Amino acid sequence: SSKLSVHEIITLSSIVELEGAKAADRKAVAGVFYNRLDSNLYPTLGSDATTYYASKIDDWSYSLTYKELNDCNNKYNTRCSSNTGLPIGPICNPSIDSIVNITILLIN
């Protein structure tokens, strides 16, 4: 994961944007998801934000159903064992802060 394309950086940054509720949290969130890209312990990203996006749900108080959590045909669902790595594209327009946090990880 040390060499991500611009598309992959924006995609990962968009996950960080929605998973990190506050800007102060996004550095840690970026580290977690970046490390999961190369982890044998975490074969998938397991992002709630991508699973909600995959199910076209924008109400985070909604509890995802078993069917939604296990819809592996949707390439945005990063909880499925068949959907490893990043989803097929961004799930939102990430802030500069989220992009910078991912870029710093790539540089270090």
Q: Which residue ranges define each predicted feature?
A:
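Bacterial extracytoplasmic/cell-wall-associated proteins, especially those involved in peptidoglycan
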Residues: 1-108
